[in-house]
Each structure stands twice: as structure tokens, then as C-alpha cells.
Amino acid sequence: MIAEDALDFLKIDVQGGELTTIENGRHCLASAVTIQIEVSFLPLYEKQPTFAEIDQVLRTLGFIPHTFAAINRRMIAPLFDERNPCAALNQLLEADMVYVRDFTQPQRMSDEQLKHLAIIAHHCYRSFDLATNCIFHLCQRQAIAANSMQGYAALAASVQTA
């Protein structure tokens, strides 16, 4: 059993069992700040939840969409490329969607959650704007050094140009 405060980041890729996983893991998600979940825009499996269903459940748990980690597209039949059956044009098929705790409600996150969200945003997704937002709120709370914003801005700039 995972302790309720032990989970910061969860990746869910369970081929149609996303809602069951979320429902059975609600207690583990209480402290989580990031969920990367595979969502489908077109059904691939029997009784597979749609993107809309997953989005609605995660929003009720206090998460909002942040970015796509990966997007898979396919051609729409009857168009087909025999040389590359998975060739894509514009039709969205599925994606790895990154949800984060609703950063527009920072008062609902602890200092530790904001710190962990900043670290995950920076290192996993290069989401320097989200990391900066977390650092801003931590500075406002005096939970970290007042000059942390300037230090992080310099770090993010060096990473972006590297």
C-alpha cells in the first residue's frame, strides 16, 4: 500500500482501464501534483473511457490539463499508405496528457506540493513557466529564499539556450 502523502507523480497507461485506476487510487492521488495519462480521442478498446470522461474526473479531483507529452495521429480511412500503415495526417488518435494540480488555486497546495510541482515541471516537461509560477507562490509564502525567482530565471534561461 502506498502512503497517502508518498505520491507526487503518476503515469497511467493501462489500455482502457484509466477510470478504474483513478477511482481505485483516489486516496493515493490526494498528495499527487502531476498525472501523465494516456487518453484516447477515438475508441481503441471496448468500453474505453473517452478523453472527455477522463478530463472530467481529473478536474473534479483538482487537476487541470497542462501539456501533451506525446500525440499520436492517424489517417482517416479510406486514405491509407501501404508503406506506412501508421502514417498520420491530422486526426487525433491518442495522447499522453499531462495534468497538474490546479496552479490557479495555489492556496489548495502545500509548500511541499508546490516544490514538487516545480521540480517535476522543470525536469520532466521543461515547463519553466509553471515552475516559475510555483516558485513565485513559494516566495510569497516565504517558504523559500526571497531571491529564488531571480536564481531560477537564470537557471531556466541557461537550460533553454543549452
Where in the sequence are the language-model features?
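Short amphipathic alpha-helix with an adjacent loop that forms part of the alpha/beta core around
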Residues: 1-3
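Conserved acidic-Pro-Pro-aromatic motif
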Residues: 5-129, 134, 138-139
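Short, charge-rich amphipathic alpha-helical segments embedded
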Residues: 133-162
